[in-house]
Amino acid sequence: MGATASPSRSPLRSDGFDVLYFGAVDWSHTWQRPQQIASRLAAQGRVVYVDPIGLRRLRLSDAPRLVRRLRGNGGLPAAIPEGISLIPSHAATLAAGLRAPSEWTARLVASAVRRALAEARVEHPVIWAGTPSPAVVAALDGLPSRLLVYDCLDAVT
């Protein structure tokens, strides 16, 4: 199991619909709307949560978070709610932060997500996009889906 592609921590349930959730905040960050929504969706079925992919160039202040992500722990809490599986976006975050072409980043993201979905036996999830990241938008074409929900609450600069 590769660290970036493997869902981690919680076994997935299959009694409802499946959701592939592109989060706007790291799962391990302060508990906010994206984690609340994903947790509630997990009560209905399986949720594969993808940590956010960079929206801007990396800054020096991003170094500690980036190091945690690249090491593979991302500052994860001890427990992830039942029904949620997490895909950290290590390589994609670095590529996006360095402004690699979004097509490259999209390939990294789509490949990691396809592997994780296959491991979880998720075939046609509802995709919930919580960020307008160019890499996420570009990756959508390469992913199977039943429905796309675009849910961006905040202005992203």
Positions of the model-derived regions?
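N-terminal subdomain of nucleotide-sugar transferases
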Residues: 2-71
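A general structural motif
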Residues: 16, 44, 122-125, 145
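A short, histidine- and acid-enriched strand-loop-helix "catalytic/donor-clamping" loop
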Residues: 135-136, 152-157
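Short amphipathic alpha-helical segments and helix-helix/interface helices
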Residues: 35-39, 113-117, 137-141
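A conserved catalytic-core segment of Leloir-type glycosyltransferases
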Residues: 2, 13, 52-124
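Short beta-strand/turn micro-motifs composed of small residues
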Residues: 23, 51, 129-131, 152
